[in-house]
């Protein structure tokens, strides 16, 4: 089709957006430790990361759908990312760090869900844009940038991470400015009755409940796995390597993501991912070497990616077209709220239990999410076609 957006540009958008995340999230625990923040304060700081995301994401998503312009929302958010990160460099002490976290996350939090929704909009308009292939580039961006940032932080200090974050945000903004697609839908408006119908649907609420529980565990793991690495002999460069392994392990599952969803069905894929999460966290709880911790993260592909693809595809199917960005950002808000609970609860628990006991608790939380998905499977009557190889 004439004027079709080149796939390589969308690939690079995903690469750069997830690269922005790779400059920040793997190193927040290290940053907080260097600021002299206690475990309990660290839990509060991580909870602010999630709480800010949970509040900001639906607002950004609503604006993107209301004005039918995901591209403009991404440009505004990325411009905020370019500048806001320097507040972390200047902050000192728990309260200033906390305010900086709120500022940074206000602009960072919409990037992934709105980019996801933008990709789905491109696919509906042009066809041939498979989400899993683009998300693969996101994982690659996160992996390479996290690895580079870990090495750079060890060489030159934490400040270099903020410069890289700002540069990646600027690069992503330039890429999106070069894409001439605004997903405008004249005559389509967001109606509050549609929102009420969607979010009172018991299937949607069960799915979001399972996402919430899963990300209580995922959020706690993401924040405190650096402590597990230190407890088993690792350092900051090994943390960068760990997140590189996490992201690289996602690639084959994202490449074949659409086939896996069609073959298993969304909810069956969700069940497999959650069962693997239970095993993954139990294995983490008995590690005695950072090498083993890194090796276990190879399970990321069929844990987190199965859960992510299953949830997004199910929501995209259940939501009416005018509410798909809202649905994506509410999913992201459930992820963020779960992360907030996991971060805050994990920080408090670590005042009383070891990091190894915390991982046993995370396995139990994932088992509870598995129960919710099993109930959802029982009430979901939609037949999903099996993929013919």
What label would you give each PLM region?
Residues 1-4, 179-211:
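Juxtamembrane intracellular "pre-TM" segments in multi-pass secondary transporters
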Residues 2-50, 204-242:
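Helix-loop boundary and gating motifs at the non-cytosolic
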Residues 39-40, 125-137, 236-237, 319-331:
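Loop-to-transmembrane helix entry/capping segments in MFS-fold secondary transporters
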Residues 55-69, 153, 252-265, 350-351:
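Helix-to-loop junctions at the C-terminal end of transmembrane segments
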Residues 66-78, 262-274:
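Cytoplasmic membrane-interface "Motif A"-like loop-to-helix N-cap segments
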Residues 79-92, 275-288:
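C-terminal ends and interior cores of transmembrane alpha-helices
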Residues 104-137:
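Cytoplasmic helix-loop-helix junction between adjacent transmembrane helices
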Residues 151-168, 348-366:
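A membrane-interface helix-boundary motif in multi-pass transporters
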């Amino acid at each position: 089709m004439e004027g079709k957006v080149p796939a390589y540009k969308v690939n690079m958008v995903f690469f750069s957006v997830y690269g922005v995340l790779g400059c920040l999230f793997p190193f927040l625990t290290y940053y907080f430790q260097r600021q002299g923040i206690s475990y309990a304060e660290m839990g509060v700081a991580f909870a602010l990361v999630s709480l800010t995301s949970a509040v900001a994401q639906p607002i950004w998503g609503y604006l993107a759908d209301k004005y039918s312009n995901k591209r403009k929302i991404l440009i505004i958010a990325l411009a905020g990312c370019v500048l806001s990160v320097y507040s972390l460099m200047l902050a000192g002490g728990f309260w200033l760090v906390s305010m900086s976290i709120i500022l940074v996350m206000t602009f960072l939090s919409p990037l992934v869900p709105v980019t996801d929704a933008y990709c789905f909009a491109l696919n509906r308009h042009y066809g041939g844009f498979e989400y899993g292939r683009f998300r693969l580039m996101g994982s690659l961006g996160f992996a390479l940038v996290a690895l580079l940032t870990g090495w750079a932080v060890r060489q030159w200090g934490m400040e270099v991470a903020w410069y890289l974050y700002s540069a990646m945000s600027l690069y992503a903004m330039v890429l999106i400015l070069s894409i001439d697609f605004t997903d405008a839908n004249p005559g389509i408006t967001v109606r509050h009755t549609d929102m009420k119908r969607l979010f009172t649907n018991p299937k949607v609420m069960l799915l979001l409940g399972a996402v919430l529980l899963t990300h209580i565990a995922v959020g706690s793991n993401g924040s405190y796995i650096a402590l597990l690495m230190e407890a088993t002999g690792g350092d900051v460069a090994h943390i960068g390597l760990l997140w590189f392994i996490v992201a690289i392990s996602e690639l084959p599952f994202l490449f074949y993501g659409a086939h896996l969803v069609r073959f298993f069905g969304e909810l069956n894929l969700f069940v497999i991912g959650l069962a693997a999460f239970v095993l993954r966290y139990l294995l983490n709880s008995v590690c005695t070497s950072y090498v083993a911790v890194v090796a276990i993260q190879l399970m990321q592909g069929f844990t987190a990616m199965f859960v992510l693809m299953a949830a997004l595809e199910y929501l995209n199917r259940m939501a009416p077209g005018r509410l798909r960005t809202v649905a994506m950002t509410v999913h992201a808000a459930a992820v963020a709220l779960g992360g907030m609970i996991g971060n805050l609860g994990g920080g408090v628990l670590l005042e009383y239990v070891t990091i190894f006991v915390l991982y046993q608790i995370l396995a139990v939380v994932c088992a509870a999410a598995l129960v919710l998905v099993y109930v959802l499977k029982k009430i979901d009557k939609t037949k999903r076609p099996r993929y013919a190889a």
